[in-house]
Amino acid sequence: MNNLLALIHPKAKHMRKISATLTVAAAALAFGALPLQVQAADDAVRIGVLTDMSGIYSDQNGSGSVTAVKMAVEDFGGKVLGKRIEVISADHQNKSDIASNLSREWFDNKKVDMIANLGPSNTALAIIEIAKQKNKIAISTGAAAIKISNEGCTPNSIHYVYDTYALANGTANAISKQGGKDWYFITADYVFGHSLEKDATDVLKTTGGRVVGSSRHAVNASDFAAFLLKAQSSGASIIALANAGGDTVNALKAANQFQITKSGKQSIAALVLFLTDVHALGLETTQGLLLTTAFYWDRTDETRKWSKRFFDRMKRMPTDAQAGDYSSTLHYLKSIQAAGTDEAGPVMAKMKATPINDMFATNGRIREDGRMIHDMYLAQVKTPAESKTPWDYFKMKAVIPAAEAFQPLSKSTCPLVNKPK
């Protein structure tokens, strides 16, 4: 038969060789004999910074987050396991569908290995789901909803900087203990705002406080007058802002305009307040506000040294999210080196097994729910007279130890957590 085929088609012998070669190659792929060739073809470790680059959360994330990630890559040496390290970035415009589409495109076509920052909670949850599907890593530094390390946890995701439990546990707890018992919430109407209001309400239940009312506003609201006047008429001693970024800035501007606190009977509580918010508003407007933060540039010699380097590039001091972008990226690269691969599973195992000690955290560690636990700090915004230099905005009031700052594993709803029966 072979001889007959050769007579009919003079190239038949050559065709049989091609067929045999393809058969061997297919078998090799089926039994995993070629992964080294596939791995060698991907000659880079790629990090994508997907965040808000132009909207209400861009000051605390944005281009500063991209800069922080690039600083970590440079400090690591620009290569890992002989591969160059590349950083790409994009603006998801705080929209979940755009975040999903971009992350899928990055994982499938750009060969991105890890996505950093993720932006607010709605986009973070969307990216985390795609990372799980593609078996890639997602590190949230810009989002706060505790859902990320609760029911939304995955084997591939890390919640690195703060969450609504830690923020409420610090600020709401401190204000309530100072006598602020009756609260009215002005809340961003999406998963982050809802989570922050709930966690703060849970704190009040343990301190003898109570909620007398709440209003919800759309993200990127321009007019807070109606919400503030309603809160004022409620008689609540504390008007709590369960929002962030530009929404917090606009709400505080309006509260100052309407002189909400002039009577001395009501106070404003900004449950999430960033260094950049204070810079935008000025100390006259923000002085005296309590806040909970994961990082402050002027806390130690190490934070000052790193922050100066950041300032030299960005002409502004870093937020805790941006400092977390640097720390988490460096920890990720060190874990690739230690694991000997950039595959998600082994790298995540190393990240969880290795303590984090740098300018951001001391003895930080990543739990099985993906929550990185570390000390948090209760701070207060300085008065104009107390501030001596540019960006000298916070005075540290107390350290909140990691074990107290974050939700205990015993209360976790993460399916990855093994609880004692």
Residue ranges and their predicted role:
Residues 3-5, 16-18, 36, 40-421:
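Extracytosolic ligand-binding ectodomains
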Residues 23-33:
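Bacterial N-terminal signal peptides
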